[in-house]
Amino acid sequence: MERYDNAFTELKARKEGAFVPFVTLGDPGPEQSLKIIDTLIAAGADALELGIPFSDPLADGPTIQSATLRAFASGVTPTQCFEMLATVRQKYPTIPIGLLMYANLVFNRGIDEFYAECARVGVDSVLIADVPIEESAPFRQAAMRHNIAPIFICPPNADDELLRQIASHGRGYTYLLSRAGVTGAENKAAVPLHHLVEKLAEYHAAPPLQGFGISSPEQVTAAIEANAAGAISGSAIVKIIEKNVDKPDQMLTELRDFVTVMKAATRHA
């Protein structure tokens, strides 16, 4: 959990926002997946948001669903994902690593066992996409027992009560939704969410990172101008993987170029 605090403190000192890429672990295969993560970090990613492949990803648009299918096709299992996470953590001791996933995967291992495993491999946060905050108690309690930050989604239409709950129960960062719906670069992020960012700050919530539909440097700049602590980009990155499945070197080059440009947009003029 401390890795998020340290990262945000350092970024603030450098007058930068965070750029956080999302990829599915094991897409398009375990070996290339680790090379992708190396490339994202080398190009300037400030934290990682990683998915564990799941057979029924409700909140994901078609791009990330196909990433999941590619990972499945390469034979990736949740156990293998944890091994990959341990490898990444060993290589990069300070970068914050978050998981974005679904409750079924947690139930399959047992809630406490799942968070214990996260702690063992060096995961910092877990966002469970299909568990609303009012049903989150067993998950967040297990998370806190194992020093894992429970992450909550703040939707664009959040009322004061929800904002208070998010501030009270969330740690690490707050996932600020650009809009309701499923993920994807197909749907452009809407207007910057000044109002929500101000409210979250008023309730002392964890720093907000804006996600959903972030695919251009202009959107990153807009998120930071709205006082978000940074931006998360998933579908745009996964599209680069998809487009270059048969060209692994080209894939890494394009990912590096994309992350470099997106990271540059986090630097305040």
UniProtKB/Swiss-Prot annotation:
Catalysed reactions, semicolon-separated: (1S,2R)-1-C-(indol-3-yl)glycerol 3-phosphate + L-serine = D-glyceraldehyde 3-phosphate + L-tryptophan + H2O
Pfam families in the cross-refs = Trp_syntA
InterPro entries annotated for this entry? Aldolase_TIM, RibuloseP-bd_barrel, Trp_synthase_alpha_AS, Trp_synthase_suA
Q: Which UniProt keywords apply?
A: Amino-acid biosynthesis, Aromatic amino acid biosynthesis, Lyase, Tryptophan biosynthesis
Q: Which domain of life is it from?
A: Bacteria
Instruction: Give the matching Gene3D superfamilies.
Output: Aldolase class I (3.20.20.70)
The EC number(s) given in the record are 4.2.1.20
The GO terms this record gives for MF are:
tryptophan synthase activity
Q: Active site: which residues?
A: 49 (proton acceptor), 60 (proton acceptor)
Cellular component GO terms held in the UniProt record: cytosol
Pathway assigned to this chain's UniProt record = Amino-acid biosynthesis; L-tryptophan biosynthesis; L-tryptophan from chorismate: step 5/5
Question: What family does this chain come from, according to its entry?
Answer: Belongs to the TrpA family.
Q: How does it assemble?
A: Tetramer of two alpha and two beta chains.
Family matches, as HAMAP family: Trp_synth_alpha
Sum up the protein's function in the record's words.
The alpha subunit is responsible for the aldol cleavage of indoleglycerol phosphate to indole and glyceraldehyde 3-phosphate.
Can you name this protein? Answer: Tryptophan synthase alpha chain
In its UniProt entry, the species of origin is given as: Enterobacter sp. (strain 638)
